[in-house]
């Protein structure tokens, strides 16, 4: 797949590393993103899966949706386990032991396992320079355990632990910017993606895994169950997230920012918010606050990409 053109579907391999027949909810954007991500890769991959939706709906014994070596970890230690696998292979090579050539290690987790519970292990693995890829499949709450808020839940969203009511607008804090946190570790590759832009997603995952050293990919994964939205609008919701600036698509390659989608003008965030039940309680004033915040953050991102503010930073290379 090294030379495939991401805009030519017929050149993509037919092989699937993630099978159908899993137990995801109807319209699950995470399952779609998962399939796309691993379809971009060959079969020389070891998958390290943090506890969460992906682990639950893909691996209930005696069944499995994985055609790859796969290990289930705790919520908090997927990056640590991935680090150990990578270091173990390195030690085996030093001792002259037989090791499969070009084996890749990919850790995956949801937004809770990434931005909250597993943040320390991820930060450590990125800082140490382990040669692995971490992919966050972000559905913006702890969906597996009952739609509880996480630090990746958007401002104003209603969840079971940030309910909307007379004295609450829902989520009270702004979404944690995990891609920027990853980029702050000066690693070679960081990217954002969404299943609604499938070939962009596949290209970025392939690029991340082929990068020498640590790489981080953050994928927005629409969750109709938790977002209280129609199951047939999953692709539309992902596109609107990008087109409104709520979830911009970009790469950070060796410190240099690059926008992935050219948007001459952002669509109003209301177009995105109004099709999700978790935002139906928001007043016009709160929506204006969200609009202002999105425009400010998007402009900052454009300036980084335009001026190469980050290009002078020296990215860490893999050990």
Listing of model-derived features with the role each one plays in the protein:
Residues 221-319:
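Flexible, low-complexity linker and terminal segments
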Residues 9-13, 101, 151-207:
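Conserved thiamine diphosphate
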Residues 136, 191-193, 216-220:
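Short, conserved beta-strand edge motifs with alternating hydrophobic and charged residues
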Residues 148-155, 198, 205-212, 229-240:
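Short, surface-exposed, charged loop/turn segments at secondary-structure junctions
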Residues 15, 27-31, 75-79, 172, ...:
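Electropositive phosphate-/nucleotide-binding environments in soluble metabolic enzymes
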């Amino acid at each position: 797949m090294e030379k495939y053109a991401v805009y030519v579907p017929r050149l993509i391999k037919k092989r699937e590393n993630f099978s159908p027949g899993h137990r995801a909810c109807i319209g699950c954007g995470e399952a779609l993103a998962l399939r796309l991500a691993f379809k971009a890769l060959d079969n020389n991959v070891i998958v390290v899966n943090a506890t969460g939706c992906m682990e639950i709906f893909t691996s209930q014994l005696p069944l499995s949706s994985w055609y790859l070596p796969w290990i289930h970890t705790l919520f908090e230690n997927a990056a640590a386990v991935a680090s150990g696998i990578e270091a173990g292979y390195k030690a085996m090579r030093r001792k002259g032991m037989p090791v499969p050539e070009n084996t890749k290690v990919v850790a995956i987790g949801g937004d809770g396992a990434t931005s909250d519970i597993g943040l320390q292990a991820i930060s450590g693995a990125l800082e140490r320079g382990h040669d692995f890829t971490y992919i966050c499949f972000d559905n913006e709450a702890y969906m597996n355990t009952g739609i509880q808020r996480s630090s990746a839940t958007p401002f104003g969203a209603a969840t079971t632990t940030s309910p909307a009511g007379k004295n609450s607008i829902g989520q009270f804090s702004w979404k944690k910017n995990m891609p920027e946190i990853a980029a702050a570790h000066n690693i070679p590759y960081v990217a954002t993606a969404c299943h609604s832009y499938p070939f962009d997603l596949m290209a970025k995952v392939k690029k991340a895994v082929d990068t020498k050293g640590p790489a981080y990919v953050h994928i927005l994964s629409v969750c109709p169950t938790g977002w209280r939205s129609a199951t047939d609008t999953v692709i539309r919701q992902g596109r609107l997230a990008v087109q409104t600036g709520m979830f911009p698509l970009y790469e950070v390659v060796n410190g240099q920012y690059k926008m992935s989608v050219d948007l001459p003008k952002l669509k109003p965030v209301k177009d995105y918010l109004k099709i999700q039940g978790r935002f139906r309680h928001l007043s016009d004033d709160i929506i204006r606050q969200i609009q202002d915040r999105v425009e400010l953050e998007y402009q900052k991102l454009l300036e980084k990409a335009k001026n190469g503010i980050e290009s002078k930073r020296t990215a860490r290379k893999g050990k």
